[in-house]
């Protein structure tokens, strides 16, 4: 093992694809999140590994709970280096599904105080235990990710970006 | 130390989360260990919540520690059940509440205070945090 160099500048990339979604029978979100947590733990501080873990679990859970095109593919891509952590999760979606997600992203992206948005939403929805969007809100409020959603060739593509300033 | 009650989440035949309520003299200790990632945690923890509602009012408690240090992850599906457990403590026993958490953990430092409802003055006034290094 090399003792030289700055380990928190290590470039790591991973791409995982699973198709069809319908064949998934277990906790795929947890498996992928924990795998990436352990892999990044070789190079990066625990706090960064936890961010990757949380974003993969929340975004993949969203896919497994809401994706209606079950014969399509789930794609998870991770890229990290000294500058940024970028995680992309893609799944097949109808234009209507993309529109619904996109509206939610707009609300989250426009929030002046993401933490207050998360808190207000949790308290408001607690009565009927409604979920819808809490996972996305926590990624901006808690983990400080910048989220974007795009529609590319029939796929909903969600990108979560965390600038590594102060960590690398 | 007397165990008052406990709750557990099983996933794929394995225990993935458990919470135990213990009494050490007049000190109530609630531990939270593992991960909450299942779709419907109430399916596993509703009995625990019912038991807490029954046993806590019968105890003589002067202080409480809620220990989250070994709770590595809680996805958004688990937010409400954590709120219900901590509510049981704040509503059913008196005294100060110490919350043990990991110092540099995003979910424990950013979201957990929301779930504790620290925006309520009477809860904030009873609560202090003990930040520890990750185990």
Positions of the model-derived regions?
Chain B
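STAS-like cytosolic regulatory interaction modules
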Residues: 1-72, 84-135
């Amino acid at each position: 093992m090399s003792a030289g160099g700055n380990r928190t500048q290590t470039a790591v990339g991973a791409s995982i694809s699973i198709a069809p979604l319908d064949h998934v029978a277990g906790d795929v979100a947890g498996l992928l999140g924990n795998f990436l947590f352990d892999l990044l733990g070789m190079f990066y501080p625990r706090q960064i590994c936890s961010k990757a873990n949380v974003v993969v679990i929340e975004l993949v859970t969203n896919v497994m709970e809401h994706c209606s095109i079950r014969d399509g593919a789930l794609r998870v891509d991770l890229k990290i280096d000294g500058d940024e952590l970028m995680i992309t999760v893609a799944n097949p979606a109808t234009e209507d599904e993309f529109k619904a997600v996109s509206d939610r992203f707009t609300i989250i992206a426009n929030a002046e105080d993401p933490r207050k948005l998360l808190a207000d939403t949790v308290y408001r929805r607690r009565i009927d235990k409604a979920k819808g969007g809490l996972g996305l809100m926590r990624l901006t409020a808690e983990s400080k990710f910048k989220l974007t959603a795009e529609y590319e060739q029939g796929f909903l593509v969600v990108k979560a970006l965390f600038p590594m300033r102060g960590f690398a | 130390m007397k165990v008052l009650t406990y709750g557990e989440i099983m996933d794929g035949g394995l225990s993935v989360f458990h919470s135990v309520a213990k009494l050490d003299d007049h000190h109530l200790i609630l531990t939270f260990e593992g991960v909450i990632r299942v779709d419907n945690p109430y399916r596993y923890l509703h009995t625990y919540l019912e038991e807490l509602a029954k046993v806590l009012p019968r105890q003589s408690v002067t202080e409480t520690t809620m220990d989250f240090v070994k709770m590595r992850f809680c996805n958004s599906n688990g937010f409400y059940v954590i709120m219900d457990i901590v509510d049981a403590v704040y509503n059913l026993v008196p005294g100060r509440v110490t919350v043990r958490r990991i110092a540099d953990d995003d979910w424990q430092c950013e979201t957990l205070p929301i779930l504790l409802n620290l925006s309520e003055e009477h809860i904030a006034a009873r609560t202090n945090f003990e930040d520890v290094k990750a185990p």
